[in-house]
């Protein structure tokens, strides 16, 4: 089963894929200019890789849980996925963990690497 995960942020969407059920690979993050453009780009990515299951990071706990959860679920609805199952996975601490994993490996530029590594962690937790 081909699986993808996304870590939805306000500026970037981290993306990771797992094509064999074992190895999770971070992909280039999707820059988010607006939600319609971002949803089109995510949907195109899912179609390109023929993804069958999408795992979406969702915050559990914290002061912004309800608001961010609502925004994330709304964004997923914009994808209009018909043949792709969607599941949600707790994303708590994934951005912090991604920064810890990459400390000293590359500079923390705003190019989305951290976001996609967070998506990788989300998918690894789900697996």
In which residue ranges do the predicted regions lie?
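Phosphate- and other anionic-substrate recognition elements at nucleic-acid/protein interfaces
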Residues: 2-3, 10-127
């Amino acid at each position: 089963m081909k699986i993808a995960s996304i870590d939805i942020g306000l500026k970037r969407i981290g993306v990771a894929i797992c094509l064999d059920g074992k190895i999770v690979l971070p992909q280039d993050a999707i820059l988010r200019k607006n939600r319609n453009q971002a949803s089109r780009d995510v949907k195109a990515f899912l179609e390109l890789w023929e993804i069958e299951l999408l795992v979406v990071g969702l915050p559990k706990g914290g002061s912004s849980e309800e608001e961010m959860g609502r925004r994330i679920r709304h964004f997923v609805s914009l994808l209009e996925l018909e043949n792709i199952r969607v599941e949600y996975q707790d994303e708590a601490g994934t951005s912090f963990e991604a920064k810890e994993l990459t400390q000293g490996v590359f500079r923390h530029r705003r190019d989305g690497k951290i976001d996609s590594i967070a998506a990788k962690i989300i998918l690894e937790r789900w697996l």
